[in-house]
């Protein structure tokens, strides 16, 4: 099992180093994994002039999974758009046809005070958002800005095919079947024909999953319900644009994006795994970044791409035990806790892995 490690930019190398320590621990226990580093984003631009160089493309194709730190930095803002670090991330997603984005939204009991919502509203929060990643209005054609009747007009095309909807629906139903058996599909079928088709295809697909309870919700109501009563949701499936917005909204229910992993999968469960936070150049090199989202992304990788459920669960339990022991990086620190840096947080997680 070959894993490409793409540390990226900003705090990426610091947080990746801690996730790599966790993976090497399992390697020493006998897990047959091979770890190979590569360049993506700004570091790749600096080294090769390209955000997604050919060597990284080959590595990504050959690897069974990819673990990413973060990409981006203000020093690259003056580059042509196609040379900016973020284009490397878009390119690797396209190259690998990663169409399913999975975002767990979990609030650890130890961090309940970090949420801006009342503890009784978010206690026990555990949602999985499944977002279609390669279609919808972000990629539909035609698109552009042009002159019509003497003025500029901007336009985009929201479009989905039956097959695109069906394949993401299967991912969501299967995920719900592994969890609590409830799936909510989010659309805007009352005004958008594209999402009427979405609802029709998801409803049809449900016939193959009799053990999963399907519900539908309009996106404006879903945005409201995520704040009003987020615990009503188990798995949520939606299109690219709605998922982009709702997953960011849901992530803030936990109080810290430094805790949240994500996965982007192809149709064979090969995936790109990464924390949802950015490269945080303002704290890069200070040794204070929270590595837990990257460590939890490694756990997702072991679960979804390698079917190593036991190892994944052990990592998650080690993270929770570390929080129970009151260790906190600066982003999740509160009075009375033990403030630690990036490396020491990694030390604590490893110690808890070893003391199972």
From Swiss-Prot:
Transmembrane feature ranges: none
EC code(s) of this entry: 1.1.1.85
Binding site for substrate: 93, 103, 131, 220
Reported cofactor(s): Mg(2+); Mn(2+)
Pfam families assigned to the protein according to its UniProt record, in alphabetical order: Iso_dh
Subcellular location: Cytoplasm
Recorded catalytic activity of this chain's protein: (2R,3S)-3-isopropylmalate + NAD(+) = 4-methyl-2-oxopentanoate + CO2 + NADH
The protein's annotated pathway: Amino-acid biosynthesis; L-leucine biosynthesis; L-leucine from 3-methyl-2-oxobutanoate: step 3/4
InterPro entries noted in UniProt: IsoCit/isopropylmalate_DH_CS (IPR019818), IsoPropMal-DH-like_dom (IPR024084), Isopropylmalate_DH (IPR004429)
Gene Ontology MF term list: 3-isopropylmalate dehydrogenase activity; magnesium ion binding; NAD binding
Chain sites annotated for binding Mg(2+): 220, 244, 248
Feature type site, description Important for catalysis: 138, 188
Coiled-coil region(s): none
Enzyme class: oxidoreductase
HAMAP family documented for this protein: LeuB_type1
Name of this chain's protein: 3-isopropylmalate dehydrogenase
Gene: leuB
């Amino acid at each position: 099992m070959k894993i490409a490690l793409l540390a990226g930019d900003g705090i990426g190398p610091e947080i990746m180093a801690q996730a790599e320590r966790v993976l090497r621990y399992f390697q020493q226990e006998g897990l047959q994994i091979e770890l190979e580093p590569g360049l993506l984003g700004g570091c790749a631009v600096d080294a090769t002039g390209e955000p997604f160089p050919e060597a990284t493309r080959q590595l990504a194709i050959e690897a069974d999974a990819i673990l990413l730190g973060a990409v981006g930095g203000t020093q690259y803002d003056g580059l042509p758009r196609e040379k900016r670090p973020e284009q490397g991330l878009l390119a690797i997603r396209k190259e690998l046809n990663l169409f399913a984005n999975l975002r767990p939204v979990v609030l650890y009991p130890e961090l309940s005070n970090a949420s801006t919502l009342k503890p009784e509203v978010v206690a026990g929060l555990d949602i999985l958002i499944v977002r279609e990643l390669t279609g919808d209005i972000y990629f539909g054609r035609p698109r552009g800005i042009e002159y019509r009747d003497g003025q500029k007009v901007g336009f985009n095309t929201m479009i989905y095919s039956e097959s695109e909807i069906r394949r993401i629906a299967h991912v969501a139903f299967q995920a719900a079947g592994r969890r609590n058996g409830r799936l909510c599909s989010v659309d805007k079928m009352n005004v958008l024909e594209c999402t009427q088709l979405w609802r029709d295809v998801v409803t049809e697909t449900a016939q193959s999953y009799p053990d999963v309870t399907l519900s539908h919700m309009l996106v404006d109501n879903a945005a409201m319900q995520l704040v009003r009563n987020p615990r009503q949701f188990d798995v949520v499936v939606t299109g690219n644009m709605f998922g982009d917005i709702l997953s960011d909204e849901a992530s803030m229910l936990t109080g810290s994006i430094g805790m949240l992993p994500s996965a982007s999968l192809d149709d064979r469960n090969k995936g790109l795994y990464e924390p949802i936070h950015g490269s945080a150049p303002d704290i890069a090199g200070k040794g204070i970044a929270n590595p837990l989202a990257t460590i939890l992304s490694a756990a997702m990788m072991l679960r979804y791409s390698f079917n190593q459920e036991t190892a994944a669960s052990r990592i998650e339990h080690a993270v929770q035990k570390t929080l129970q022991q009151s260790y906190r990086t600066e982003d999740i620190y509160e009075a009375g806790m033990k403030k630690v840096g990036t490396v020491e947080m990694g030390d604590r997680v490893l110690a808890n892995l070893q003391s199972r």
